[in-house]
């Protein structure tokens, strides 16, 4: 009886070739494909896995779990790796690993295989997550082991009659889920080359976007968007709706050269229309609902949290602690944010909250002003006292310093 290996199967080039490669190595392949909101035809993927030679294929709709348990933290934590990348692919990897482990345990498989290369981040994310969830399972990385070039891999696929939607002229590597779309390889590997329009799918070119803006109101409850223009949405449906609406206006294109875990720089093209709108609105609401010290400290946690996810450490004690902190800040992040969508921009035009810390009577310069300006004298004296003492001791600062 052959040993079974669960393969994270997408139906793309790498994993389709991996099925045949693992079979050649003497294993029975149990394919597993997750839907995390990419809109893929899973019936086609299911049949393709079996046609490739997999003995089983498990299709799992994890879109709602992805939005509620993972994307929700990206929103509450304003998560952006290197202040640019909203963790599109990285955010889905721990969930995918979790489901792969469940299937491996259910089918008595000896290990889990993935289609990641030896120079990417995902190999680390998957294998570290698998070790955290079930350290007895072995990890297999066919693409890393065969070390073929993209062209050699395509040749192998053609030789074994493996259908792939990729060619020598357009060898993009695409990953998509509810939170956005990531694209790399091909001409995109030249960081100076402008991305051609065929590298994009979720967003309209600026030249073709509507000449009239759309203005929407996002309503948040405990840091999570729950309504658009007064209409209730589940989080996954809300993101999909905003992907379509904001994408129509060309919002959410990101051209980023990022620092990978393995030490190289990689040029990535991301499309995150819904994410950009939600994150901008969420940050705007936090400006009136968080105290000054929390607002100033939270970005420190956000940066660490983003790096934990990017570096494949979702299942770790530190990440658990960071999640608790983020949750504790969101109790009063509730209210409405008005945001205009126009020509590639998501523009915040207003925000309100029943828990606002913004007091118009204290902020105004009209006759309604309730701020006691006489208090400023004593405040300045106390606040400036260390500076004054230092200046008296050392003779003050000269204009040349």
Swiss-Prot record:
Protein residues bound to L-aspartate: 117, 121-122
Keyword Ribosomal protein among UniProt keywords: no
Binding site residues for L-citrulline: 85, 121, 125, 173, 258, 270
GO biological process: argininosuccinate metabolic process; L-arginine biosynthetic process; urea cycle
Keywords: Amino-acid biosynthesis, Arginine biosynthesis, ATP-binding, Cytoplasm, Ligase, Nucleotide-binding
Enzyme kind, highest EC tier: ligase
GO molecular function, one term: ATP binding
Pfam family for this entry, one: Arginosuc_syn_C
Cystine pairings recorded for this chain: none
Catalysed reaction, written as an equation: L-citrulline + L-aspartate + ATP = 2-(N(omega)-L-arginino)succinate + AMP + diphosphate + H(+)
Pathway where it operates: Amino-acid biosynthesis; L-arginine biosynthesis; L-arginine from L-ornithine and carbamoyl phosphate: step 2/3
Similarity field: Belongs to the argininosuccinate synthase family. Type 1 subfamily.
Protein name per the record: Argininosuccinate synthase
Species annotation: Staphylococcus epidermidis (strain ATCC 35984 / DSM 28319 / BCRC 17069 / CCUG 31568 / BM 3577 / RP62A)
Gene: argG
């Amino acid at each position: 009886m052959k040993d079974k290996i669960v393969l994270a199967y997408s139906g793309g080039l790498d994993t389709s070739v991996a099925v045949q490669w693992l079979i050649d190595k003497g294993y029975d392949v149990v394919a597993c494909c997750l839907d995390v909101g990419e809109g893929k035809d899973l019936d086609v993927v299911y049949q393709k896995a079996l046609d490739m030679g997999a003995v089983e294929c498990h299709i799992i709709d994890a879109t709602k779990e992805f939005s509620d348990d993972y994307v929700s933290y990206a929103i509450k934590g304003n998560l952006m790796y290197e202040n640019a990348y909203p963790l599109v692919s990285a955010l889905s990897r721990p969930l995918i690993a979790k489901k792969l482990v469940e299937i491996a345990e259910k089918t008595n498989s000896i290990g889990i295989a993935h289609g990641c290369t030896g120079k990417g981040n995902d190999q680390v994310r998957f294998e570290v997550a698998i070790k955290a969830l079930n350290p007895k399972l072995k990890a297999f990385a066919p693409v890393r082991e065969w070390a073929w070039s993209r062209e050699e891999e395509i040749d192998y696929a053609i030789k074994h009659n493996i259908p792939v939607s990729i060619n020598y002229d357009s060898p993009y590597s695409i990953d998509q889920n509810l939170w956005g779309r990531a694209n790399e390889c091909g001409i995109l590997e030249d960081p100076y080359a402008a991305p051609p329009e065929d590298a994009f799918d979720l967003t309209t070119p600026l030249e073709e976007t509507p000449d009239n803006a759309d203005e929407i109101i996002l309503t948040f409850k405990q840091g999570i968007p729950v309504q658009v223009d007064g209409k209730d949405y589940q989080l996954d449906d809300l993101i999909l709706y905003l992907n379509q609406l904001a994408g129509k206006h060309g919002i959410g294109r990101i051209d980023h050269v990022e620092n990978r875990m393995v030490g190289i720089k990689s040029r990535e093209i991301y499309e995150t229309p819904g994410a950009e709108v939600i994150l901008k609105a969420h940050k705007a609401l936090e400006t009136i609902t968080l105290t000054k010290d929390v607002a100033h400290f939270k970005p420190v946690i956000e940066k660490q949290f983003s790096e934990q996810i990017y570096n494949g450490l979702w299942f770790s004690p530190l990440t658990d602690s960071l999640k608790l902190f983020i949750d504790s800040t969101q109790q009063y992040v509730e209210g409405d944010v008005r945001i205009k969508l126009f020509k590639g921009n998501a523009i915040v035009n207003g925000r309100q909250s029943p828990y606002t810390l913004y007091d118009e009577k204290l902020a105004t310069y009209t006759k309604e002003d309730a701020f006691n300006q006489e208090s400023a004298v004593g405040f300045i004296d106390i606040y400036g006292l260390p500076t004054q003492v230092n200046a008296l001791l050392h003779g003050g600062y000269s204009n040349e310093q």
